[in-house]
């Protein structure tokens, strides 16, 4: 999985207010503990 905003954007992922979404269909809560969701970005 992408580990930062740049990598996430490169694979077309995004992170909303509560949910992370990646092309691999991985879903996760946006929390400081999640490597790709340390802050809110879309």
Curated annotation (Swiss-Prot):
It holds the Pfam family Defensin_beta. InterPro entries: Defensin_beta-like (IPR001855). It comes from the Eukaryota. One of its GO terms (biological process) is defense response to bacterium. The keyword Secreted applies. Keywords: Antibiotic, Antimicrobial, Defensin, Disulfide bond, Secreted. GO terms for cellular component: extracellular region. Disulfide bonds join 8-36, 15-30, 20-37. It is found in: Secreted. Coiled coil: none annotated. Belongs to the beta-defensin family. Has antibacterial activity against the Gram-positive bacterium S.aureus 1056 MRSA (MIC=11.48 ug/ml) and the Gram-negative bacterium E.coli O157:H7 (MIC=12.03 ug/ml). Does not have antifungal activity against the yeast C.albicans 3153A. This is Ostricacin-4. It comes from Struthio camelus (Common ostrich).
């Amino acid at each position: 999985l992408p580990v930062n905003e740049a990598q996430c954007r490169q694979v077309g992922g995004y992170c909303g207010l509560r949910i992370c979404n990646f092309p691999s269909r991985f879903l996760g809560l946006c929390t400081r503990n999640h490597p790709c969701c340390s802050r809110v970005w879309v």
